[in-house]
Amino acid sequence: MLLTYVRKYRHLINIGCIPTKTLIHDGIEGSSFKEAITRKKEVVQALNNKNYQGLNSKDNIDVLNYKANFISNEVIELQDNNGTIQETITADKIVINTGSRANIPDIKGIDTAQNIYDSTGLLNIDYQPQELVIIGGGYIALEFASMFANFGTHVTILERGDAIMTNEDQDIANLIVKDLQDKGVTINTNTSTIAFSNNKDQTIIHTNHGEISADTVLLATGRKPNTNHLGLENTDVKIGKQGEVIVNKHLQSTVKHIYAAGDVKGGLQFTYISLDDYRIIKSHLFGDGSRTTENRGAIPYTVFIDPPLSRVGLIASEAKLQGYDILENKVFVSNIPRHKINNDSRGLFKAVINKDTKEILGASLYGKESEELINLIKLAIDQHIPYTVLRDNIYTHPTMTESFNDLFLEPLWSLIISGSYAGESFSCVPLYTLISDH
């Protein structure tokens, strides 16, 4: 089989997870903004080169750097940056994986005001903002707010709703708000942006509560599927209300030989969903088709604020609404010995259990290293492992993972022994603190 890969969008490496998480990491580590931007460019370039060579070095793959435009269900026209047609290719199997783009709101003055960026543009600025105003209070907004606050920028979030993180556990959401405010982040809720204007080198944000000035504005107002300018109107592929390619459980579009993977098909916008989409398409094309969107299990996610929030499954309020009889437990990060070594006591871990089956319904982990821990809980949920297995498992010490010994205890026992780890006062913790500091 000859595979032709038309390289146009590379969201993950160029403008998504890799550059943002590199900057977030370097901000936490105390790097200057200039140093972090330089390293971000190096990381992006290195991974781009690696991925390109990984594809281009294979005899049965051609990598073409063109804009792709459908002219029928089977025929794709390839154009260069000037719009000149370079060639036309025909295929009996096609995968659309063009990702997503920023959703730009219709706000007066948005086209003429200066220094207004979407997340892509903000990753490529060559100066550190002194005053950053973020329009929107979703996960992208929170990651950028936390990141720039760590670099010393004063950040203001403008959220039109009455709260942020309303879909998360509210105990944890309240802690996140407090920790962001402790960094100097201002969060203005019930605030609608009406217009933008310029005043010398400042951008003026006009809201229903007055005016705010800043040298930089981020539009964190969501993303939408990248289906524009693909020529899909020349095909029988159906598009949804948000511009997404409509697919079935095998990720086939309404034209059965055209598949869609990643953000372009709508739904959860995570890199690892796109990677699993590949497994589903591979299973349908070359296997028995048994892997589908209906059986890939619980989907974890992490919001890479500082410290990160990671979650999988249900929170308590959702579980109750679905009729479950639940057990709920929590452990504060300040009661986990590893927090002393990490020098970070911020955070709270919570778990929700099905009281009848003893299976884990969900977990929300707000604290350092949660982005790693959540994957173990995802595995337990998928494999229907009772919570007692995680409760009684032997974990290395001192680690954040050993918090599961307490997190999955019955609530009464958790209150009695939380934080009472043998060896905490005289051996492991002081030794590993010295190792960590050197």
Q: Whereabouts are the PLM-identified features?
A:
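Flexible, glycine-rich terminal cap/loop adjacent to redox cofactors
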Residues: M1, Y5-K8, I13-I18, T22-L23, ...
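Glycine-rich Rossmann-fold phosphate-binding loop(s) that bind the pyrophosphate
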Residues: Y5-V6, I135-G138, D263
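N-terminal Rossmann-like dinucleotide/flavin-binding domain of flavoprotein oxidoreductases
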Residues: H11-T88, D169-T191, A316-E318
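Glycine-rich dinucleotide-binding loop and its adjacent helix/turn
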Residues: C17, I96-H154, L158, T186-I187, ...
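Rossmann-like dinucleotide-binding cores of NAD(P)H-dependent redox enzymes
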Residues: E42-Y52, L123-N124, P129-V133, Y139-Q202, ...
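A Rossmann-like FAD-binding core segment of flavoenzymes
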Residues: D62-N65, N69-N82, I89, G152-K249, ...
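FAD-site-proximal beta/loop scaffold in flavoenzymes
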Residues: T112-Q128, E211-D288
